[in-house]
From Swiss-Prot:
Belongs to the metallothionein superfamily. Type 15 family. It holds the Pfam family Metallothio_2. Metallothioneins have a high content of cysteine residues that bind various heavy metals. One of its GO terms (molecular function) is metal ion binding. This is Metallothionein-like protein type 2. Keywords: Metal-binding, Metal-thiolate cluster. PANTHER family: METALLOTHIONEIN-LIKE PROTEIN 2A, METALLOTHIONEIN-LIKE PROTEIN 2B.
Length: 78
């Protein structure tokens, strides 16, 4: 099982880089931006959604990423 640039290896034989995007926000982009920071007071969020134990939020084509960038199950249908 490989982990290439945040993609779990879920190709044939559980290898390659065509599987789940474990870290989709980690990409390098060079640009100039202006940021505005807004501080304020809002309502307290008491519910953070429901998620089963051991379930990963990242999934692609039936291929779910588990811990250590391993796919569970290793069966991508691309």
């Amino acid at each position: 099982m490989s982990c290439c640039g945040g993609n779990c290896g879920c190709g044939s034989g559980c290898n390659g880089c065509g599987g789940c995007k474990m870290y989709p926000d980690l990409s390098y982009n060079e640009s100039t931006t202006t940021e505005t920071l807004v501080l304020g007071v809002g309502h307290e969020k008491t519910s953070f959604g429901t998620m089963e134990m051991g379930e990963s939020p990242a999934a692609e084509n039936g291929c779910k990423c588990g811990s250590e960038c391993k796919c569970n199950p290793c069966a991508c249908s691309k």
